[in-house]
Protein backbone atom coordinates (compact mmCIF):
# COMPACT_ATOMS: atom_id res chain seq x y z
CA UNK A 1 0.00 0.00 0.00
CA UNK A 2 1.07 3.58 -0.65
CA UNK A 3 1.15 5.83 2.39
CA UNK A 4 1.55 9.51 3.08
CA UNK A 5 4.83 10.39 4.73
CA UNK A 6 6.53 13.50 6.05
CA UNK A 7 10.29 13.90 5.99
CA UNK A 8 11.68 15.97 8.84
CA UNK A 9 14.96 16.84 7.08
CA UNK A 10 13.29 19.27 4.69
CA UNK A 11 14.82 22.69 4.09
CA UNK A 12 11.32 24.11 3.56
CA UNK A 13 8.77 23.27 6.29
CA UNK A 14 5.90 23.49 3.77
CA UNK A 15 7.57 20.97 1.46
CA UNK A 16 8.02 17.90 3.68
CA UNK A 17 5.59 15.61 1.86
CA UNK A 18 6.79 12.24 0.69
CA UNK A 19 5.40 8.89 -0.31
CA UNK A 20 6.33 5.57 1.25
CA UNK A 21 5.12 2.01 0.99
CA UNK A 22 3.89 -0.34 3.68
CA UNK A 23 3.82 -4.11 3.17
CA UNK A 24 1.88 -6.78 5.02
CA UNK A 25 1.48 -10.51 4.62
CA UNK A 26 -1.59 -10.68 6.86
CA UNK A 27 -3.11 -7.14 6.81
CA UNK A 28 -2.54 -6.97 10.58
CA UNK A 29 1.23 -6.54 10.87
CA UNK A 30 2.77 -3.92 8.61
CA UNK A 31 6.33 -3.05 7.68
CA UNK A 32 7.00 0.54 6.66
CA UNK A 33 9.51 0.79 3.83
CA UNK A 34 11.74 3.81 3.13
CA UNK A 35 10.25 6.84 1.41
CA UNK A 36 10.27 6.67 -2.38
CA UNK A 37 10.57 10.44 -2.78
CA UNK A 38 12.60 13.27 -1.29
CA UNK A 39 11.46 16.39 0.59
CA UNK A 40 11.46 19.90 -0.89
CA UNK A 41 9.45 18.94 -3.98
CA UNK A 42 6.60 21.44 -3.67
CA UNK A 43 4.13 19.90 -1.21
CA UNK A 44 3.60 19.86 2.55
CA UNK A 45 1.09 17.04 2.29
CA UNK A 46 0.13 14.48 -0.33
CA UNK A 47 -2.75 12.07 0.19
CA UNK A 48 -5.16 9.60 -1.43
CA UNK A 49 -2.46 7.98 -3.56
CA UNK A 50 -3.32 5.69 -6.43
CA UNK A 51 -0.97 4.01 -8.89
CA UNK A 52 -2.26 2.72 -12.22
CA UNK A 53 -0.92 2.08 -15.69
CA UNK A 54 -3.22 4.21 -17.82
CA UNK A 55 -3.08 3.59 -21.56
CA UNK A 56 0.46 2.26 -21.19
CA UNK A 57 1.76 5.08 -18.96
CA UNK A 58 2.50 4.40 -15.26
CA UNK A 59 0.75 7.19 -13.33
CA UNK A 60 0.73 8.26 -9.69
CA UNK A 61 -2.36 10.16 -8.64
CA UNK A 62 -2.73 12.14 -5.40
CA UNK A 63 -4.42 15.20 -3.98
CA UNK A 64 -3.59 18.06 -1.66
CA UNK A 65 -5.23 21.24 -0.42
CA UNK A 66 -4.08 24.76 -1.26
CA UNK A 67 -2.37 25.50 2.06
CA UNK A 68 -0.20 22.41 1.47
CA UNK A 69 1.47 23.52 -1.74
CA UNK A 70 4.67 25.52 -2.06
CA UNK A 71 4.77 29.29 -2.43
CA UNK A 72 6.08 28.76 -5.96
CA UNK A 73 3.08 26.66 -6.97
CA UNK A 74 0.71 29.13 -5.30
CA UNK A 75 2.39 31.97 -7.21
CA UNK A 76 1.56 30.09 -10.43
CA UNK A 77 -2.12 30.16 -9.42
CA UNK A 78 -2.47 26.63 -8.06
CA UNK A 79 -5.01 26.18 -5.28
CA UNK A 80 -4.60 22.46 -4.71
CA UNK A 81 -6.72 19.62 -6.04
CA UNK A 82 -5.95 16.41 -7.94
CA UNK A 83 -2.37 15.98 -9.17
CA UNK A 84 -0.68 13.31 -11.26
CA UNK A 85 2.75 12.45 -12.54
CA UNK A 86 4.25 9.77 -14.74
CA UNK A 87 6.39 7.41 -12.65
CA UNK A 88 8.55 4.33 -12.94
CA UNK A 89 6.67 1.06 -12.57
CA UNK A 90 8.71 0.17 -9.48
CA UNK A 91 7.63 3.49 -7.88
CA UNK A 92 11.22 4.41 -7.06
CA UNK A 93 12.60 7.94 -7.24
CA UNK A 94 9.23 9.73 -7.21
CA UNK A 95 9.74 13.42 -7.97
CA UNK A 96 6.70 15.48 -7.00
CA UNK A 97 8.21 18.51 -8.76
CA UNK A 98 6.92 16.90 -11.97
CA UNK A 99 3.34 16.67 -10.68
CA UNK A 100 0.71 18.52 -12.70
CA UNK A 101 -2.65 19.75 -11.50
CA UNK A 102 -5.61 18.13 -13.24
CA UNK A 103 -7.46 20.78 -15.31
CA UNK A 104 -10.72 20.42 -13.37
CA UNK A 105 -9.70 22.29 -10.26
CA UNK A 106 -12.73 21.86 -7.98
CA UNK A 107 -12.29 18.13 -7.35
CA UNK A 108 -10.52 16.25 -4.58
CA UNK A 109 -9.85 12.69 -3.33
CA UNK A 110 -10.09 11.06 -6.74
CA UNK A 111 -9.95 7.49 -8.02
CA UNK A 112 -9.18 6.10 -11.44
CA UNK A 113 -11.66 3.48 -12.60
CA UNK A 114 -12.05 1.51 -15.80
CA UNK A 115 -15.36 1.29 -17.61
CA UNK A 116 -16.71 -1.92 -19.17
CA UNK A 117 -14.89 -1.14 -22.43
CA UNK A 118 -11.53 -0.70 -20.65
CA UNK A 119 -11.48 3.09 -20.91
CA UNK A 120 -10.16 5.07 -17.96
CA UNK A 121 -12.29 7.52 -15.99
CA UNK A 122 -11.59 9.79 -13.05
CA UNK A 123 -14.15 10.14 -10.29
CA UNK A 124 -13.67 12.51 -7.39
CA UNK A 125 -15.45 14.52 -4.78
CA UNK A 126 -16.51 18.00 -5.80
CA UNK A 127 -14.81 20.27 -3.31
CA UNK A 128 -15.98 23.89 -3.36
CA UNK A 129 -18.19 25.66 -5.89
CA UNK A 130 -18.78 29.40 -5.52
CA UNK A 131 -17.30 29.28 -2.03
CA UNK A 132 -19.62 26.50 -0.81
CA UNK A 133 -18.53 22.97 0.04
CA UNK A 134 -20.34 20.40 -2.14
CA UNK A 135 -18.93 17.00 -1.11
CA UNK A 136 -20.68 15.00 -3.85
CA UNK A 137 -19.09 12.67 -6.37
CA UNK A 138 -18.61 14.14 -9.82
CA UNK A 139 -19.67 12.34 -12.96
CA UNK A 140 -16.91 10.13 -14.41
CA UNK A 141 -14.39 12.14 -16.43
CA UNK A 142 -12.89 10.19 -19.37
CA UNK A 143 -9.09 10.43 -19.14
CA UNK A 144 -5.90 9.18 -20.71
CA UNK A 145 -2.25 9.54 -19.73
CA UNK A 146 0.54 11.50 -21.33
CA UNK A 147 4.14 10.44 -20.54
CA UNK A 148 5.07 14.07 -19.82
CA UNK A 149 1.84 15.72 -18.61
CA UNK A 150 0.44 12.83 -16.57
CA UNK A 151 -3.31 12.36 -16.41
CA UNK A 152 -5.29 14.46 -18.91
CA UNK A 153 -8.94 14.63 -19.99
CA UNK A 154 -9.60 12.47 -23.02
CA UNK A 155 -10.15 14.56 -26.12
For every predicted segment, state its role:
Residues 1-155:
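Carbohydrate-active catalytic/glycan-binding domains of CAZyme proteins
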Amino acid sequence: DLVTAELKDSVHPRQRAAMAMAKSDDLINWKLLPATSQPDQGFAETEVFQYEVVDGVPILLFCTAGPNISDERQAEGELGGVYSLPVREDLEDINFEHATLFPRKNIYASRLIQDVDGGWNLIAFINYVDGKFVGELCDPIPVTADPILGLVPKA
